[in-house]
Amino acid sequence: MAENRMLTVFYQKFASYKLQLFSNRSKILGQEKTKQQICDKPRLQIGPIIVAVDTSESMYGQPEKIANSLLIQLVRMAKKQRRKCFLITFSVIAQTMDLAHPANWDKLKDFLDHGFSGGTNGEEMLKIALRVLETETYSLADILIISDFEFSKPIKNTIYKMCEERAMGVRFYGLQIGTASREYDKILDRIWKV
């Protein structure tokens, strides 16, 4: 029992360390997303976050605990920095939760209590993330995918849309639990291995 609690504390501290990438940027406000913007470098603006958590069977067990710890730390950080946060959970189907609304925070606890199972549909998750980017609230959001990345690369049309968003300043990040897959190393802007 004490060992499980210590492991959970370790995951939370480790998650906090890994998530510092979002809190180390300068605050520049009032930047609008336009088609003319071309960005080769990450924005300095601290904006909203879209986080996608892989809830497939391959994430069951220790990866699930790590993913949940990362998510808890990310939500805490978003609240502290007053950043809006949108959650996408994905396995065979994807589910969404807008954590910018405090009423949804209780639903987050329900999510954390469910086990991970099923296959993985990364394509659906990316399509949802791209649709959320079209909203005013989440325009220019950072996208963070927490996964083992054991799913197919996106189709060409999705990669094209990701490139369009990237040209406007959106950045796509990954926190990879395990090191089995390297499929997304060239698709995302940066992947940290956990």
Residues of each region from the PLM?
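Acidic/polar low-complexity segments with low predicted structural confidence
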Residues: 1-46
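Von Willebrand factor
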Residues: 44-101, 106-146, 150-153, 174-183
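Conserved ATPase-coupling elements of RecA-like P-loop NTPase cores
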Residues: 62-64, 154-157
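A generic secondary-structure signal
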Residues: 73-77, 128-135, 161
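Catalytic-core regions built around general acid/base machinery
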Residues: 74, 159-167, 172
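Loop/turn elements at helix/coil->beta-strand transitions in domains of secreted/extracellular proteins
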Residues: 81-83, 139, 168-171
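Von Willebrand factor A/integrin I-like adhesion domains
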Residues: 102, 180-194
